[in-house]
Design a protein with these regions (language model features):
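Core catalytic lobe of class I
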Residues: 1-172
């Protein structure tokens, strides 16, 4: 796969917990530790009547690039409803007494807050797991939600870029 990637290319590899530690070592060997970008945790809610042990509610996706000039589009999530974001983003300055005050225009009006982009997405993604009766289901046993694939593709490519799905969409 490394051979066919452009110098700005990325690779995202999903793995279950049983072999993720082996895959990480292999990927470090192939792409180099310096091209490791992130270990994305895909978390979801599932219920089970398992009586012993911890219920697995996440999977791992390794994100590597071919070089340091990789393509990456930042995504933003909405601010928490309890965050007073207008106040946080408001421009401020110090008055003659050294006290921090909101900036005002020539007319004495408070200058509006900066653009609200949101919070950059972290490496923990909460995306619902496909339930067995979901309309999106294709019958493939390890199918991933389209929302998960969509986020990865939009994060690592632009419109018109070539994206390789080595499983030809059978899992999505």
């Amino acid at each position: 796969m490394k051979r066919v990637l452009k110098s700005t290319g990325n690779i995202f590899l999903h793995c279950n917990t049983a072999s993720s530690h082996h895959l990480r070592i292999l990927l470090d060997e192939i792409f180099g530790e310096n091209n490791f970008r992130s270990e994305i945790i895909w978390t979801y809610k599932r219920w089970s009547n398992t009586r012993k042990g911890l219920l697995p509610n996440h999977q791992t996706i390794f994100f590597y690039s071919k070089t340091n000039q990789y393509k990456f589009n930042t995504f933003y999530e909405d601010y928490s409803p309890t965050t007073n974001i207008d106040q946080i983003l408001q421009d401020r300055e110090r008055n003659v007494y050294g006290k921090t005050v909101y900036k005002r225009d020539a007319g004495g009006n408070t200058i509006p807050a900066k653009e609200k982009k949101g919070v950059p997405v972290s490496d923990v993604w909460e995306i619902p797991f496909l339930n067995p009766k979901a309309k999106e289901r294709t019958g493939y046993p390890t199918q991933k939600p389209i929302e998960l694939m969509d986020r990865i593709i939009k994060m690592a490519s632009d419109e018109g870029d070539i994206v390789l799905d080595p499983f030809c969409g059978s899992g999505s």
